[in-house]
């Protein structure tokens, strides 16, 4: 994802929840700095005690009002009530989710309150195992972004 973002001219920074990722190609920052500086946050982390509800109300409060939040990792990394609040209160601009905390989406999921597709997009989670699946998906994303730009 980082290399694709760079192709679009993005300055890529990252936070490692484990501290083990030492990728020299991109600037590593702490979580607070990631939240404050990012125009777009894309989550790609395992679910563990350190990441469960990592993105809570306090995290969304620190993000830019113009920020876009994307979670393609695990649903429970995000406090869905906090995300609903952040979208309703315009604390962030928008969110796109490929995963939820509980799938299929329950009737009582707070995200159901967000009816504006400009604020929230939820897509079905697809398996990433086959290389062809990833290539097809990324090619589609690339083409869609090109159309917008």
Tell me what each language-model feature is.
Residues 66, 72-149:
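Rossmann-like dinucleotide-binding domain for NAD(H)/NADP(H)
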